[in-house]
Amino acid sequence: MSSSPAARRELSYSWGYLFFDEPPLSVEKAWRLVQSSRFGKTLILVGDVVSKSFRERGLGDFFIVDGHTRRNLKVEDLPGKAEAFTCKNRPGEISRECYELLRNLLTSAIGRGKKIVVYVEGEEDLLSLVALLYCPLNDSWVIYGNFRGYLEVIPCTSFFRSVAENLLVKHFEKD
């Protein structure tokens, strides 16, 4: 699926909780929010810097990374005993391969106590929408770094799931 100009416009708006601090402060604030909420503690992390920042504090259950960062950081130290998967995804798109992989993993594999890492060949940015669509409802959070540099922390609720679904249906052209 390719994103339309309208999708890019709508995705420029922020949703969920926003943290404008740099790591580690942003991570600490986000984790306090998660701990004090009723939405579970499962963390789905999208992006290399976010994944690295949370992982350095022993946090995270599901990681979606592409090996590229705007800050040119090398992301290593993801969970060594994690189940690792790979898919290809071009910039500005959501490939069928990544969509299906994330849907299957998020609906069946997450929550079994094992860490999961999805390595994306290409770009992972838009895959946060798929994560929101299939995250464990009322029991998880999708967290990613916004292109403006702040941390977006979104509880997996029916409201945010419907926002992601509407964006995908209305503003992504099926290939």
From Swiss-Prot:
Protein name: GTP-dependent dephospho-CoA kinase
InterPro entries assigned to the protein according to its UniProt record, in alphabetical order: GTP-dep_dephospho-CoA_kin
Electron transport listed as a keyword: no
Keywords recorded for this protein, A-Z: Coenzyme A biosynthesis, GTP-binding, Kinase, Nucleotide-binding, Transferase
EC number of this enzyme: 2.7.1.237
Reactions accelerated catalytically: 3'-dephospho-CoA + GTP = GDP + CoA + H(+)
Pfam family, one: DUF359
Source domain of life: Archaea
Segments crossing the lipid bilayer: none
Annotated GO biological process: coenzyme A biosynthetic process
Organism: Thermofilum pendens (strain DSM 2475 / Hrk 5)
Binding site for GTP: D48, V49, V50, D66, E124
Physiological role: Catalyzes the GTP-dependent phosphorylation of the 3'-hydroxyl group of dephosphocoenzyme A to form coenzyme A (CoA).
Annotated family: Belongs to the GTP-dependent DPCK family.
Annotated metabolic or biological route of this protein: Cofactor biosynthesis; coenzyme A biosynthesis
PANTHER family per the UniProt record, alphabetical: GTP-DEPENDENT DEPHOSPHO-COA KINASE, UPF0218 PROTEIN TK1697
Catalytic EC class: transferase
